[in-house]
A protein has these predicted regions:
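Core AdoMet radical
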Residues: 1-48, 132
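Auxiliary Fe-S-binding modules of radical SAM enzymes
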Residues: 46-152
Length: 152
């Protein structure tokens, strides 16, 4: 029970389709589990944002993947229908790393066209609690080394 312990939730919602979640994360029931968790998080916290800083609430982060714009739109539809008035962060930072020879369809950054399709859909459908990233955020310089540098 986390009621009253968490001020801000920043959950990711990557997939809505089981075939995608199974292929990329080996989690066929990803959306079933994630959607339940999101509803519980939403129940626990109410948004308090003064225009500069969020004091409490939830921001659902969605990473747009190459060749998956229709899935991104389905996720936006889900949020609009089931978690209205929830902040959404559309992330353009996908940067392919490692050996993706088994996943050639995501072995590239998203294109401006893909990004614009999802962003325009969100704007057209009145997502007024929306954070966005620039396409330039998809750069390996933003990826930490994961070598414990700076960890006490």
């Amino acid at each position: 029970e986390l009621d009253g312990l968490i001020d801000i939730y920043l959950p990711d919602l990557k997939y809505i389709r089981p075939n995608k979640s199974m292929r990329y994360s080996k989690a066929y029931d990803y959306f079933d589990k994630a959607s339940l968790a999101l509803k519980e998080m939403r129940r626990q916290v109410k948004d308090e944002f003064d225009g500069k800083i969020m004091k409490s609430g939830m921001i659902i982060r969605h990473l747009i993947l190459p060749q998956n714009t229709n899935s991104s739109i389905e996720i936006l539809d889900y949020i609009k229908s089931n978690l209205p008035d929830t902040y959404v962060s559309l992330m353009a930072q996908y940067t392919p790393c490692g050996d993706l020879s088994d996943y050639p369809e995501i072995n590239r950054k998203i294109t401006k066209r893909e990004y614009d399709k999802v962003l325009n859909y969100a704007l057209y459908n009145s997502f007024d609690k929306l954070f966005i990233q620039e396409l330039s955020s998809a750069d390996k310089s933003f990826i930490p080394k994961f070598d414990f540098t700076g960890v006490l």
